[in-house]
């Protein structure tokens, strides 16, 4: 648990709530807890040069005061490194006009009397010359996680060499790979190297549509972008697009601790599979990039619906092992729909 960014956030927020409640009661002041980051963020093109940013608040089931009162819209223009405020609204959408053909990026920050939430993921847009239907970029890389771990008899620890996990934004706490896995070695158990002490480890920045959008812009197209949550919820209709770029990055299904909280960060959820199946059946073009695009489907609690999606929509099946059964798909031995190994 301790190395998982989501767990760190949960613990940190719990401590913050406890301190805030103590001070509120001691000083007889109103208690308002800062909001959670917004969800289902999306950018849609309403008409030429006109766009709408939309999102939804994220309720805190443990704290009813944590609902936002308003939202701050932050923007970054092409060539800029930082964001600047362009507006506020109490609604869950914000309309704007774009008068150029540059790439513009946006974040939404929820706030109330308790303070500011963490910023949303970063989405981007570009208005192309003419009035072409934009490409839709879907950010499906939402994963943040600890390194892989294992327990095997007297040995246990982290398998960071197999799966390093994904820090939130960046990590400065990693000192080196674990070297002592024997649980009977007393205080030496868990010892790790120190050759990464001065290194900053890159994590999930939640800021990828602008990178993909630059390549799309170089090809002469405009684009809008959406969180995968907005697609799964139906807020974004795929039927309005001809081309989709799905970013999966290091997305990969996994569990936290004993797994009671369920499977997280699956590359293709049942609803996403359904939406993409309909989109491709209607003639849409789909480009997918990521580290575990197919292997994740066949490697972690997959069902017949997952296999059908992989075979029919993605056009791949796992290669058969010589003795029968399925090979480890992580080997890269996949068959395209025409039966050739890829």
Go through the PLM ranges and name each one.
Residues 22-65, 114-132:
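Pro/Thr/Ser/Gly-rich low-complexity, intrinsically disordered linker/stalk tracts
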Residues 69-73:
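Short beta-strand elements bearing conserved aromatic residues within extracellular beta-rich modules
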Residues 1-26:
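Active-site-adjacent mobile loop/cap segments within catalytic or ligand-binding domains
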Residues 96-116:
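Beta-strand-rich modules
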Residues 84-91:
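Short beta-strand segments within Ig-like beta-sandwich modules, predominantly Fibronectin type-III
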Residues 1, 141-145, 230-232, 249-254, ...:
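Solvent-exposed loop/turn segments at secondary-structure junctions
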Residues 251-342:
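A glycine-rich, often tryptophan-bearing local segment used as a flexible ligand/cofactor-contacting loop or short
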Residues 121-242, 247:
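Aromatic-Pro/Gly-enriched surface loop or interdomain linker
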């Amino acid at each position: 648990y301790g190395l998982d960014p989501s767990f760190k956030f949960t613990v940190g927020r719990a401590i913050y709530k406890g301190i805030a409640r103590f001070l509120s009661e001691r000083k007889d002041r109103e208690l308002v807890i800062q909001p959670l980051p917004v969800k289902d963020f999306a950018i849609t093109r309403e008409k030429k040069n006109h766009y709408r940013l939309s999102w939804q608040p994220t309720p805190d089931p443990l704290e009813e005061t944590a609902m936002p009162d308003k939202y701050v819209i932050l923007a970054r223009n092409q060539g800029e490194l930082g964001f600047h405020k362009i507006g506020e609204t109490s609604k869950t959408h914000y309309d704007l006009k774009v008068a150029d053909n540059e790439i513009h990026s946006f974040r939404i920050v929820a706030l109330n009397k308790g303070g500011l939430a963490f910023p949303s993921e970063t989405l981007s847009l570009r208005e192309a010359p003419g009035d072409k239907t934009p490409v839709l970029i879907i950010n499906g890389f939402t994963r943040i996680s600890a390194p892989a771990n294992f327990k095997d008899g007297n040995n246990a620890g982290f398998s960071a060499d197999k799966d390093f996990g994904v820090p939130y934004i960046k990590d400065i706490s990693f000192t080196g790979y674990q070297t002592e896995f024997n649980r009977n070695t007393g205080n030496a158990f868990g010892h790790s190297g120190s050759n990464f002490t001065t290194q900053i480890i890159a994590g999930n920045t939640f800021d990828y549509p602008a990178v993909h959008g630059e390549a799309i812009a170089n090809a002469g197209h405009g684009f809008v972008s959406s969180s995968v949550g907005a697609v799964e919820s139906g807020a974004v209709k795929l039927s309005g697009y001809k081309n989709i770029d799905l970013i999966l990055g290091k997305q990969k299904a996994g569990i936290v601790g004993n797994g009671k909280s369920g499977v997280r960060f699956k590359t293709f959820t049942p609803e996403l599979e359904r939406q993409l199946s309909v989109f491709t059946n209607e003639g849409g073009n789909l480009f997918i990039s990521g580290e575990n695009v197919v292997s994740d489907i066949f490697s972690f609690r997959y069902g017949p619906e997952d296999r059908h999606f992989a075979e029919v929509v993605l056009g791949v099946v796992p290669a058969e092992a010589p003795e029968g059964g399925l090979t480890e798909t992580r080997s890269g031995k996949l068959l395209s729909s025409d039966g050739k190994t890829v």
